[in-house]
Amino acid sequence: MVRFTLNGQSVSSNSPVDTPLLWVLREELKLTGTKFGCGIAQCGACTIHLDGSAARACVMPLTAVENRSETTIEGLATPAGAALVSAWEAEQVPQCGYCQSGQIMQAATLLEKNAQPSESDIVSHMDGHLCRCMAYPRIKKAIFAASRAMSGEMLGE
C-alpha cells in the first residue's frame, strides 16, 4: 500500500507500485482532470504538482509519490490557480480543452515562483506543453492576465 497526500487529503492506493500515477488518479481515485496525452512525458497533458513542483504523472510510478504531497487540477486552490482559471475564461483560451488542465498546472508553478513573469519567462516555463489547437498566443495572454489579476489589476484591461 502506498500512502500520500492528494489535494490536501491523506489517501492510499493498493495498485501495483509501478503503476503510473496518472492511472491511479484517473481509474482508482476517479480524478479525471489530469489527462493522458502521449504517455512519454512529452506533451504536458498529465501535469500535476508534486511537492509544489510541476511533474508529469504519465511516467511517474506510484511508488515515487509515497509520503509526498501532490495536487491535481481538481485541488488547485491557490491564488495563482484561481487567477489562471479566471484568466483562461476571460481570454477564451480553451478550444478542445484537452491540454488545459496541464497548461494551468504548469502556469501555476510559474506564477507561484514569479508573479510578474516576462514573455521569455512564460515561453521558457511553458516549453514542452503541447496544444493541438495552437492556442499558444491566448495561453500566453491568459498568463499575463492572471499575473496582473494577482497584483490587483482587473482582467481584460
Regions found by a protein language model. Give the residues of each.
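Signature of N-terminal electron-transfer/Fe-S-associated modules in redox systems
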Residues: 1-157
